[in-house]
């Protein structure tokens, strides 16, 4: 399963994990220490992606095609 993130900058990322799991990672980072990033895996490239939880505008389950 993948989840789409849209940041306040307009950047879009498709990351591994269902929406609830990705939401939990983002919330945990937001509640963590100052400037803690949410570490995710970009679905297409398998690269690590660090996201500032304060910059997430939209999180939604990606459609499977």
Model segments located where?
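Eukaryotic intrinsically disordered, low-complexity regulatory linkers and tails enriched in Ser/Thr/Pro
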Residues: 1-65
